[in-house]
From Swiss-Prot:
Xref: HAMAP family: RNApol_bact_RpoC2 (MF_01324)
Matches recorded under CDD domains: RNAP_beta'_C
Cofactor note: Binds 1 Zn(2+) ion per subunit.
EC number(s) stated in the UniProt entry for this protein: 2.7.7.6
Subcellular location: Plastid, Chloroplast
Organism name: Lactuca sativa
Gene Ontology molecular-function annotations: DNA binding; DNA-directed RNA polymerase activity; zinc ion binding
Keywords: Chloroplast, DNA-directed RNA polymerase, Metal-binding, Nucleotidyltransferase, Plastid, Transcription, Transferase, Zinc
Biological processes, Gene Ontology terms: DNA-templated transcription
UniProt-recorded name of the protein: DNA-directed RNA polymerase subunit beta''
GO CC terms: chloroplast; DNA-directed RNA polymerase complex; mitochondrion
InterPro entries in the cross-refs: DNA-dir_RpoC2_beta_pp, RNA_pol_beta''_euk, RNA_pol_Rpb1_3_sf, RNA_pol_Rpb1_4, RNA_pol_Rpb1_5, Rpb1_funnel_sf
UniProt-listed PANTHER family: DNA-DIRECTED RNA POLYMERASE SUBUNIT BETA
Gene behind the chain: rpoC2
Length: 1381
C-alpha cells in the first residue's frame, strides 16, 4: 500500500469499512488502471496486512461463545400456540391444506427471522467483542445465517426436491438436535449421501441430454441471408439495464438503427459496450437483433446469427462447435453451483407480507365500493383493494388517515372498532428478481375412508370430459362421509343387502370372516356367497357355518339383525336373483312361559311384494334343533299330505313355496357324533388310516384330536377328510345289515349285553381296506331328538287370522329342512327343523297372488309399523268397492297392545292416484302409499305392540351415544325412538313404503318444525343432496359399511325444542362446533341422516375446504380409501435459496412438462383471440401471423423461464446458449391428416424449415402443427440414427432404422466419433464451396426481389409489435414472460 501511495500524487483517504462488494469494485478499478500484474502485487500486500492484524488480535472460538438468545423460549411457545389454532381451523374445514401449510411456514419463518434480528442487539448489549459476533460480519468465513443456526434456531428446511418440510427445527446447533430434527437436517447436508447423489446424477444426466440435442450444431457459414430479427427494448420497464446490456452485447444487428434521420448502427454490425451505451443514452427505437431463432440454416448456424464468441471479443470462428458449448454451459452450473456461495444447509429463505397497524384505538371507516370480499392466502376473510384506499380511524380526540396501496388485503370491516397496533391491512410483498415465486402442485390425500360428496357445482376439465377430473369454480367443502368400504376380490359375494345391520362377529363375505360391528349400506350386486353354494348341496359336502344367521344378535354395541337365510341345499345364486329381503320380528309375551328365541321370528317377503299361494310368511328356527358339532344325522320320515296341488308345483320368482320334498313330518331322529378334520392335500398327517388313537393325539403339526377312536382318511379333489369314529369295535361272525339303529334294550332277546344298554346305539359295517373281504362292526352312541311342539306362532297374531275364513288363512307347519336319509355335518352349525307360518286363501277364488305392503301408524308421536296383505286380481280388470263406509281406519287413543281394527271388518279400496295425506299431528291417522298404482282389495294387519320392539337406550353401550343427555332428559320417551343406534330399523330395504312430505312446512309436533321439501322419500334411508340440490337415495354407492362409531345421536330437550329454527334439514352438512339450538349440544361435523321429533342422527364426515381452480379427483358419491388423492391445488410458493430447486425447474421447462393451470374457459379465449387478430389485420394474414407469433412467443417464453431459474441463483448464462437448445426442441412440426400431402405421411415429425421449403417447391399446402419436444424426445428424433442409438434404446432404434432404410449422412460429431471418423469441426471443418458472392447475376436479382418481399413481411410481423403485444396481454396472463428477453 505504501508503494501505491508513493506513486499517486493526489492521496485520498476513505474512512469506511470495505466489505466484499466494495473490494470487488476496488479490484476492478485497479485492473482497469494498472493491469493484472500490478493488481496482484497490491492484493498480496493487502493479504499480508490482514494476516498480521488477525495474528495480533488472536481471536479464538469456543463453545462458551455461543450465547442463546433469551427471548427464544417465549417466541417458540407463541409460534406453537398459533400452529395449534391453525390445526384446529383446518380440522373444522375453515382453511385447506395449502393455506395451512403456507401459514405454518410463515409463522415459523417470521419466528426464525425475528430471532435472527434479535441476535445482533443481544450480542452488542451482552458481549460486543464476542468472536462469533465479529466473525459473522467479517465476510471472510461464515455469514449471519450460519451464526443464526448456531445460536438461534435452524428453522424450516427444504427436502432434496426443494419442497418445504413444514416441521421446523426448533433447536439450534448449540443446544443439539433431536433424532427427528437430525434426520431432517441431513436433507440439507453438504457432503451427505442425499445431497451428493441426487444433485450430481441429476446435473450430469441433464448435461448429457442437452449435448445429445445440439451436438451437431456447428458454425458453417458466414451469413444465412435472413432478414428476420427479434425486437428488444428497455422502454416497457420489464427489463433492467443490466439484463438489457447482457442481452445485446455480442449480438449482431438485424436492421439499421436510426435516431431521427441519423443512422447510428448498420445491419450485420456486432454490438459492443460502446454501442449499447449509446442505445441506453439515446433511448433508441426497439432494436432488432439476429438470434439462432432467426437463422435460416437447417442443421447448423451462421456466424452473424450466433454473434461474438464467448471466449474472445470477435465473431465466432467457422467450424466452432457452438452446440456442445451451449449444452455444457447450461448443464455445468448444476454440478458446480453448490460449491459457489455460503451453504446454509437447505434452510428455507422466503418473505413475509408487510402489515399495516392501527395507530390508535378507534372506529375504522372506508369506502366499501372500492373493495370486494376475498380470502387471504391464509384463508382468512378479507377485502381486496382494487386501487389506493384511504382508511379513516376516528378516535376520541384525533382522526388518522391511512392509505392502503392497491392489491392489498383489508382485514377489518367497515365501522369496526380497532385497538392500537392491531393489524388492519396486509400489503403483498413485491417480487424481486432474486426472490421469485413459482407455481407448484399440492396433492391432498384422504386420511379416512368413505363416500365423497360436494355441495357445489363442478366443471369437467376439457381434456377429462369423460373422466373423473373436475374443476372447482368457487370455494366450497368436499366431504368424506365416514364408512368402512369392503375390500373384496372377484368371486366372493356379499350376503348383505342395502340398510342391513351386521353382527360384531358375523359372516359377511367369506365363511368365518370376522367383520367390524357396523351397519351396511350395500346393494347386493355380486355373487351371493361362495363356491360352496354354487349348486345343490350333495351328500357329504361341507356346509359352512350358518349359526349366526337369521337372528337378532344382541351385542355390546346394539341389537342387530342378521340379513339372510342360508339353507343347506338351496341355490343361493337363485336367491339373490329373487331379491328377497327379511323383516325380523322380536316378540316378548309377558306373563306366558313361551320359548322365545334370541333370533326372534323372521318374516320373509319378496321385494316386489307379491305372495303366491302357500307362501311362507314367517318362520322360526328352534335353537334346540341346531347342531354345532360335526357328525351324522339319521332321519326316519314319512310323507305328509300335500297342501300344494300338482299344478302349483312351480317356483314363483321371488317367493318360496312348499315343495313336497320339504313336507316331511318331524319324527324322532338321531345324531351320531363324529370328529371330522378337513385338511389340504399337502398336510403331513401323523396318524395312519384304520388306526385306533386316543383322545388328545397329535394328528397334524398344529391339530390334536378331541376324542379317541378309529381313524379313517378319505381323499376328495384336492382335500383330505380325516374322520375319527368314537365307540366300540366288534368282529362278529356274520353281519346282516350294514347300518342299523338299536333302541335301548333292543337287539337279540337272548343277548345279555344289549339288554343292559340304556341308550340308543348305531351300528355300521366297515371294511378294513378296499381289497379285503373281512368286515368289522363299529358301535357308536347316538343322541336322539324327540318331536316337540315348539313355539306357537299363532299367539303372535290376532286369533281372527288363524281361523279359516273366506279371505286369508294362516297355518302353522313344522317341517324338516333336509330330506336326505343320512345328513353329514362337518365342522358347522345347521338348522334341522323349522316352524313356518303358511299363507293361503280360498281355492275357489280366481286370485293368484296377494300384495304385501307396510302401513305406518302414528299415535301420540309414537310410530308403529303394520303389515298389510291385499288379495289382488289383475290391476286392469279390478273395480274397487267399499263394504264398510264407517271404517275410518283410526286406532283408538288408549294405545292398547292389540290393534282394535278388525282386519276383516272392512275392505278398503283406493283410487290409482297417490294418496297425499300430510303429516298431521292428529292421533292415530294411518298414512299409506299405494304400491305403484296397484289396486287394493283387502287389508290384513299382523300386529302386536311388541312386534317391533324398540329397546331402551340404556342397554346400548355404543360410545357415541350421548349418555349424559339421557340422564339429564328423563322426560324423553327414548323407548319410543327409532333409529340406527337402537335395536335396529324396524323396516329394512323395503321400497314400497314412502314417507310423504308436502310442499308446505310440516309441524310434526308442536315443538319441532321440518323444513319444506318437495320430494317423496323412502323411510329411514340415507338421504343425500346431489350437486343440483335434489335429495335422492345413493343406490350407486355400494359396499359401504357404516360403523356405529360414525353415527352420532343428539337429543333435543323439550325446553329448547321450541326455539329450534328449521335450519337442520335432511341431508344437510354441518361443520364441527355448530349449535343448531340455543343451549343445545355442539355438533360434530357430518351429514344429517335422520330428523325426528326429539333427536337427529348425524353421520360423521370430514370436511376438506377447496378453493376455486382446485382439481377434484373422483366422482360424486365415489368410495374413497385412505390415501387416495382427493384434490389437487395449484399455488405459488417462495423458492428456497439453493440450486436444489433450480435443477428440477430447468429440467421441467426443457422437458416441456408444464404445471401451469389451464383456464376453465380457455376455448372461449382462443376464439376471441382469433376474432381480434382477424379484425385487426384482415382475413388473409390473420392465421398466418397467429401461427408465426405462437412459435416466436413460445420460444421466447421458454428462454425466459430457464434464465429466470439461473438468475435467481446468481448464475449468468448468455441467452444464445439457451436459444440454441430451445431452437432444436421447437424446430419440429407434426404433419396433420388434413388435406393429406403426397410427400409426408400423417403423424410424421419433420423440420419446420424443411416443411416450408417443400411446400414452396411443390406449390402445395402442407398442413402441420407446431409441437414442443422435450430434450429427451428431441434427442430421439434427429437426422442421425447412430446418434439416437448411442443415447438410449439402442436395439429398438437400430432395428427401426434398418426396417425404414434410413441413411445417416454423418453430419454430426457423435456419429463420427462412434465410427472413428474425423469430426466436422475445427481443423476437420471444410468451408462450403458455394458462397453468396459466386452467385450469377440473374439469380442474385431474383434473390433481391425476394428479399424485398420478405422485408415487407417483416414489417408486418415485427414492426407492429405493440399491436400484437396489446392483443396478447389481453388474452394471456403471463405477459411478462411473453414480452421480450
Amino acid at each position: 500500500m505504501e508503494v501505491l501511495m508513493a506513486e499517486r500524487p493526489t492521496q485520498v483517504f476513505h474512512n469506511k469499512v470495505i466489505d466484499g462488494t466494495a473490494m470487488k469494485r476496488l479490484i476492478s478499478r485497479f485492473i482497469d488502471h494498472y493491469g493484472i500484474g500490478y493488481t496482484s502485487h497490491i492484493l498480496d500486500q493487502v493479504k499480508t496486512l490482514g494476516f498480521r492484524q488477525a495474528t495480533a488480535a488472536s481471536i479464538s472460538l469456543g463453545i462458551d461463545d455461543l450465547l442463546t438468545i433469551p427471548s427464544k423460549r417465549w417466541l417458540v411457545q407463541d409460534a406453537e400456540q398459533q400452529s395449534f389454532i391453525l390445526e384446529k381451523h383446518h380440522h373444522y374445514g375453515n382453511v385447506h391444506a395449502v393455506e395451512k401449510l403456507r401459514q405454518s411456514i410463515e409463522i415459523w419463518y417470521a419466528t426464525s427471522e425475528y430471532l435472527r434480528q434479535e441476535m445482533n442487539p443481544n450480542f452488542r448489549m451482552t458481549d460486543p467483542f464476542n468472536p462469533v459476533h465479529i466473525m459473522s460480519f467479517s465476510g471472510a468465513r461464515g455469514n449471519a445465517s450460519q451464526v443464526h443456526q448456531l445460536v438461534g434456531m435452524r428453522g424450516l428446511m427444504s427436502d432434496p426436491q426443494g419442497q418445504m418440510i413444514d416441521l421446523p427445527i426448533q433447536s439450534n446447533l448449540r443446544e443439539g438436535l433431536s433424532l427427528t430434527e437430525y434426520i431432517i437436517s441431513c436433507y440439507g447436508a453438504r457432503k451427505g449421501v442425499v445431497d451428493t447423489a441426487i444433485r450430481t446424477s441429476d446435473a450430469g444426466y441433464l448435461t448429457r441430454r442437452l449435448v445429445e440435442v445440439v451436438q451437431h450444431i456447428v458454425v458453417r457459414r458466414t451469413d444465412c441471408g435472413t432478414v428476420r430479427g427479434i425486437s428488444v427494448s428497455p422502454r416497457n420497464g420489464m427489463m433492467t439495464d443490466r439484463i438489457f446490456i447482457q442481452t445485446l452485447i455480442g449480438r449482431v444487428l438485424a436492421d439499421d438503427i436510426y435516431i431521427g434521420s441519423r443512422c447510428i448502427a448498420t445491419r450485420n454490425q456486432d454490438i459492443g459496450v460502446g454501442l449499447v451505451s449509446r442505445f441506453i443514452t439515446f433511448r433508441a427505437q426497439p432494436i432488432s437483433i439476429r438470434t439462432p431463432f432467426t437463422c435460416r440454416s437447417t442443421s447448423w448456424i451462421c456466424q452473424l446469427c450466433y454473434g461474438r464468441s464467448p471466449a474472445h471479443d470477435d465473431l465466432v470462428e467457422l467450424g466452432e462447435a457452438v452446440g456442445i458449448i451451449a449444452g455444457q454451459s447450461i448443464g455445468e452450473p448444476g454440478t458446480q453451483l453448490t460449491l459457489r456461495t455460503f451453504h446454509t444447509g437447505g434452510v428455507f429463505t422466503g418473505g413475509t407480507a408487510e402489515h399495516v397497524r392501527a395507530p390508535s384505538n378507534g372506529k375504522i371507516k372506508f369506502n366499501e365500493d372500492l373493495v370486494h370480499p376475498t380470502r387471504t392466502r391464509h384463508g382468512h376473510p378479507a377485502f381486496l383493494c382494487s386501487r389506493d384506499l384511504y382508511v379513516t380511524i376516528e378516535s376520541e380526540d384525533i382522526i388518522h388517515n391511512v392509505c392502503i396501496p392497491p392489491k392489498s388485503f383489508l382485514l377489518v370491516q367497515n365501522d369496526q372498532y380497532v385497538e392500537s397496533e392491531q393489524v388492519i391491512a396486509e400489503i403483498r410483498a413485491r417480487t424481486s428478481t432474486l426472490n421469485l415465486k413459482e407455481k407448484v402442485r399440492k396433492h391432498i390425500y384422504s386420511d379416512s375412508e368413505g363416500e365423497m360428496h360436494w355441495n357445489t357445482d363442478v366443471y369437467h376439465a376439457p381434456e377429462f370430459t369423460y373422466g373423473n377430473i373436475h374443476l372447482l369454480p368457487k370455494t366450497s367443502h368436499l366431504w368424506i362421509l365416514l364408512g368402512e368400504p369392503w375390500r373384496y376380490s372377484l368371486g366372493p359375494c356379499s350376503i348383505h343387502k342395502d340398510q342391513d345391520q351386521m353382527n360384531a362377529y358375523s359372516l359377511s363375505v367369506k365363511p368365518r370372516y370376522i367383520a367390524n360391528p357396523s351397519v351396511t349400506n350395500n346393494q347386493v350386486r355380486h355373487k351371493f356367497f361362495s363356491s360352496y353354494f354354487s349348486g345343490k348341496n350333495q351328500k357329504g359336502d361341507r356346509i359352512p357355518d350358518c349359526s349366526e344367521l337369521n337372528r337378532m344378535t344382541c351385542t355390546d354395541h346394539s341389537n342387530l339383525r342378521y340379513p339372510a337365510i342360508l339353507d343347506g341345499n338351496s341355490d343361493l345364486l337363485a336367491k339373490r336373483r329373487r331379491n328377497r329381503f327379511i323383516i325380523p320380528l322380536e316378540s316378548i309375551q309377558e306373563g306366558e312361559n313361551q320359548l322365545i328365541p334370541s333370533s326372534g321370528i323372521s318374516m320373509e317377503i319378496p321385494r316386489n311384494g307379491i305372495l303366491r299361494r302357500n307362501s311362507i310368511l314367517a318362520y322360526f328356527d328352534d335353537p334346540r334343533y341346531i347342531r354345532k358339532s360335526s357328525g351324522l344325522t339319521k332321519y326316519e320320515t314319512r310323507e305328509l299330505n300335500s297342501i300344494v296341488n300338482e299344478e302349483n308345483l312351480i317356483e314363483y320368482r321371488g317367493v318360496k313355496v312348499f315343495w313336497p320334498k320339504y313336507q316331511k313330518e318331524v319324527n324322532p331322529f338321531f345324531f351320531i357324533p363324529v370328529e371330522v378334520h378337513i385338511l389340504s392335500e399337502s398336510s403331513s398327517i401323523m396318524v395312519r388310516h384304520n388306526s385306533i388313537i386316543g383322545a388328545d393325539t397329535q394328528i397334524t403339526f398344529n391339530r390334536r384330536s378331541r376324542v379317541g377312536g378309529l381313524v379313517r382318511v378319505k381323499k376328495k379333489a384336492e382335500k383330505m377328510k380325516l374322520i375319527i369314529f368314537s365307540g366300540d369295535i366288534h368282529f362278529p361272525g356274520k353281519t346282516n345289515k350294514a347300518f342299523r339303529l338299536i333302541p335301548p334294550g333292543g337287539g337279540k332277546p337272548n343277548s345279555k349285553e344289549y339288554k343292559k344298554l340304556k341308550n340308543w346305539l348305531y351300528i355300521q359295517r366297515m371294511k378294513l381296506s378296499r381289497y379285503e373281504k373281512k368286515y368289522f362292526v363299529l358301535v357308536q352312541p347316538v343322541v336322539p331328538y324327540k318331536k316337540t311342539d315348539g313355539i306357537n306362532l299363532g299367539r303372535l297374531f290376532p286369533p281372527d287370522l288363524l281361523q279359516e275364513s273366506d279371505n286369508l288363512q294362516l297355518r302353522v307347519v313344522n317341517y324338516i329342512l333336509y330330506y336326505d336319509p343320512i345328513l353329514e355335518i362337518w365342522d358347522t352349525s345347521i338348522q334341522l327343523v323349522r316352524t313356518s307360518l303358511v299363507l293361503n286363501w280360498d281355492q275357489d277364488k280366481k286370485i293368484e297372488k296377494a300384495c304385501a305392503s307396510f302401513v305406518e301408524i302414528r299415535t301420540n308421536g309414537l310410530l308403529r309399523y303394520f303389515l298389510r296383505i291385499d288379495l289382488a286380481k289383475s290391476p286392469i280388470s279390478y273395480t274397487g268397492k267399499r263394504n264398510d263406509l264407517s271404517g275410518s281406519g283410526l286406532i283408538s287413543e288408549n294405545g292398547s297392545d292389540r290393534a282394535n281394527v278388525n282386519p276383516f271388518s272392512s275392505i278398503y279400496s283406493y283410487s290409482k292416484s297417490r294418496i297425499k295425506e300430510s303429516l298431521n299431528p292428529n292421533q292415530g291417522t294411518i298414512h299409506t302409499l299405494l304400491n305403484r298404482n296397484k289396486e287394493s282389495q283387502s287389508l290384513i294387519i299382523l300386529s302386536s305392540s311388541n312386534c317391533f320392539r324398540i329397546g331402551p337406550f340404556n342397554d346400548v353401550k355404543s360410545p357415541n351415544v350421548i349418555k349424559e343427555s339421557i340422564k339429564k332428559n328423563p322426560l324423553i320417551p327414548i323407548r319410543n325412538s327409532l333409529g340406527p343406534l337402537g335395536t335396529g330399523f324396524p323396516i329394512y330395504n323395503f321400497d314400497l313404503f314412502s314417507h310423504l312430505i308436502t310442499h308446505n312446512q310440516i309441524l310434526v309436533t308442536n315443538y319441532l318444525q321440518l323444513d319444506n321439501f318437495k320430494q317423496i322419500f323412502q323411510i329411514l334411508k340415507y338421504y343425500l343432496l346431489d350437486e343440483n340440490g335434489q335429495i335422492y337415495n345413493p343406490y350407486s354407492c355400494s359396499n359401504i359399511i357404516l360403523n356405529p362409531f360414525h353415527l352420532n345421536w343428539y337429543f333435543l330437550h323439550y325446553n329448547y325444542c321450541e326455539e329450534t329454527s328449521p335450519i337442520v334439514s335432511l341431508g344437510q352438512f354441518l361443520c364441527e362446533n355448530v349449535c343448531i339450538a340455543k343451549k343445545g349440544p355442539h355438533l360434530k361435523s357430518g351429514q344429517v341422516l335422520i330428523v325426528q321429533v326429539d333427536s337427529v342422527v348425524i353421520r360423521s364426515a370430514k370436511p376438506y375446504l377447496a378453493t376455486p381452480g382446485a382439481t377434484v379427483h373422483g366422482h360424486y358419491g365415489e368410495i374413497l380409501y385412505e390415501g387416495d388423492t382427493l384434490v389437487t391445488f395449484i399455488y405459488e410458493k417462495s423458492r428456497s435459496g439453493d440450486i436444489t430447486q433450480g435443477l428440477p425447474k430447468v429440467e421441467q421447462v426443457l422437458e416441456v412438462r408444464s404445471i401451469d393451470s389451464i383456464s376453465m374457459n380457455l376455448e372461449k379465449r382462443i376464439e376471441g383471440w382469433n376474432k381480434s387478430i382477424t379484425r385487426i389485420l384482415g382475413i388473409p394474414w390473420a392465421f398466418l401471423i397467429g401461427a408465426e407469433l405462437t412459435i416466436v412467443q413460445s420460444r421466447i417464453s421458454l428462454v425466459n423461464k430457464v434464465q429466470k431459474v439461473y438468475r435467481s441463483q446468481g448464475v449468468q448464462i448468455h441467452n444464445r446458449h439457451i436459444e440454441i437448445i430451445v431452437r432444436q426442441i421447437t424446430s419440429k412440426v407434426l404433419v396433420s391428416e388434413d388435406e393429406m400431402s403426397n410427400v409426408f405421411s400423417p403423424g410424421e415429425l419433420i423440420g419446420l424449415l424443411r416443411a416450408e421449403r417443400m411446400g414452396r417447391a411443390l406449390e402445395e399446402a402442407i398442413c402441420y402443427q407446431a409441437v414442443l419436444l422435450g430434450i429427451t424426445r428431441a434427442s430421439m428424433n434427429t437426422q442421425s440414427f447412430i446418434s439416437e442409438a448411442s443415447f438410449q434404446e439402442t436395439a429398438r432404434v437400430l432395428a427401426k432404422a434398418a426396417l425404414l432404410g434410413r441413411i445417416d449422412w454423418l453430419k454430426g460429431l457423435k456419429e463420427n466419433v462412434v465410427l472413428g471418423g474425423m469430426i466436422p469441426v475445427g481443423s476437420g471443418f471444410k468451408t462450403p464451396s458455394s458462397e453468396p458472392n459466386n452467385i450469377p447475376n440473374n439469380i442474385a436479382f431474383e434473390l433481391q426481389k425476394k428479399n424485398l418481399l420478405e422485408g415487407e413481411m417483416k414489417d408486418i410481423l415485427f414492426y407492429h409489435r405493440k399491436l400484437f403485444d396489446s392483443c396478447l396481454s389481453n388474452n394471456f396472463h403471463d405477459t411478462q414472460e411473453q414480452s421480450f428477453f
